[in-house]
Amino acid sequence: MDLQGYLSGRIVNRTHYTLTPVNCVTDSGGRVALGGAIEPLKEGIVFTISDIGTSGVHKRGQCMFAIYDDFGADTLSRLIVQWDSVESNEPVNLSAWIEGRESAEVVCSLESGERGQRFLTCVVDCKH
């Protein structure tokens, strides 16, 4: 897998919480812009992380999203999506979790397009 280029993604929200993008931080100390629909969305969030890979500047990093309930209460917790693409012959290693919310789970999958672009989908769901 070519690890250079963009990582586009989508966070699908299947909970009764609202996700709000906070920021993305990389190993180089830079912030990564969250592109697409970055305003709070009930259905989810679309984002793009550019220049990921062993020859890119963002080899490691994480994106944080605040989670609010629908009644406007304070932040309940944070959803974190983290990536690591240190080895050039290995795919990008992705993990995601929600801090302090055992009632919710995050499942992420990474797909590659025909031209080497990658698309990350994370589904946030309540466990019942």
Give the ranges of each region predicted by the language model.
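Intrinsically disordered, low-complexity segments enriched in small/polar residues
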Residues: 1-128
